[in-house]
Structure formats: C-alpha cells, structure tokens
C-alpha cells in the first residue's frame, strides 16, 4: 500500500478552498461535523499544485443546501484573480467511480472545525476522468502518473472493477479506458526518462 501523498496546502487555490469551507461552515451554522469529499480539478491541484480550477467538485456526507452565493476571490500566483465556488451541478454518479472511492478517500485537516474534508485518492481521481476524458482530464491523468501518485496498471485494474457498477455506454468507456491506460504508460515512460519524481 502506497504511503499517503503530500498535499500542497500553501498555494493560492488551497488557501481559497480553506476560505470557502469556512464560509460553508458559517452559512450552514454547523453544530456537528459535516463530511465533504473532494473530487475534480481542485483535488488534483492539492496533489500536484499544477492544476488551476475555479469550480469545486464536492460530495457531502449529509444532505445539504448549498447557498449559490458562496464565492471566494482568489489572487493566483501569477497575479490573476479568480472566483472560487462550489459546482452545485456536480454529481459523482456521472463519473466512473469504484465502489470504495469514498471509503478510501484521504482525510485532510483544513483547520475548519466542523468540516471533515476527505480527498479522493489519486487513483480514484484518475479513474473518475475516464468517462468524460476531455483534454483537461487527460492532462490530469498524465500529471498524477508523472508524479508517481498512481500507475497505469492500477488505473486499469480499478477502472475495470468500477465498470461493474457503471450505467451507460460501456463500449465507449472501454475505448476511453484503453486510451487512458496508454496515456498513463506514456507518462510512466516520461517519468522513468527523468521527468518529475515524487517528493
């Protein structure tokens, strides 16, 4: 079992996420801890520090009403300003997800007392990118592999297991998986040839 990877907590986006979670805690007037499972580009950013995203994909352990005006103004490292917000349309059922993805998520203390944040494993983030497989999804998979956070074999095995519970176009999904594994193997080759290495 791979050791938990380090998180990049000092980037502008990571600090913006912390502020957004504080807003959520205050607006919901939480009296007991709320589990929040982080997916998507923001989760990738916490692992890689290279992905820039403004919408936060999150799944909640309880039914919550997300105020539509929860927004944090973030000044990125290059000086540009972005608005960070929860994607209220995010739905994990549209992605390819292994049945254990929530149980295997990694706890991350953001210093917000009533928010229990869990970040999806790099492996599950990579698998979740396969159904859509847009350009940014491909980049995310490659970067996670280049950093040694997951492997082509792990992605292939986890995604194949996840397909058992997937409802949708399996032929296209299998094609996407084939391409994702090929992409991951290419990223492994780049890593082996002297690319990025894990801290």
Where does each model-flagged region fall?
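Compositionally biased terminal segments of proteins
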Residues: 1-199
């Amino acid at each position: 079992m791979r050791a938990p990877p380090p998180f990049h907590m000092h980037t502008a986006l990571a600090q913006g996420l912390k502020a957004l979670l504080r807003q959520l805690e205050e607006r919901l007037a939480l009296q007991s801890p709320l589990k929040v499972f982080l997916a998507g580009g923001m989760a990738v950013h916490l692992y890689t520090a290279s992905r820039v995203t403004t919408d936060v994909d999150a799944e909640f352990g309880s039914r919550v009403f997300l105020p539509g005006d929860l927004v944090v103004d973030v000044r990125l490292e290059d000086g540009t300003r972005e608005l960070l917000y929860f994607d209220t349309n995010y739905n994990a059922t549209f992605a390819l997800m292994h049945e254990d993805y929530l149980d295997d998520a990694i706890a991350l203390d953001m210093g917000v007392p009533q928010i229990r944040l869990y970040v999806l494993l790099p492996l599950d983030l990579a698998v979740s990118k396969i159904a859509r497989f847009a350009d940014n999804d491909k980049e995310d998979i490659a970067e996670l592999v280049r950093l040694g956070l997951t492997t082509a074999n792990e992605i292939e095995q986890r995604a194949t297991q996840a397909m058992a519970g997937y409802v949708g176009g399996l032929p296209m999904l299998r094609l996407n998986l084939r391409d994702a594994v090929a992409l991951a193997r290419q990223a492994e080759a780049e890593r082996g040839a002297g690319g990025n290495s894990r801290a």
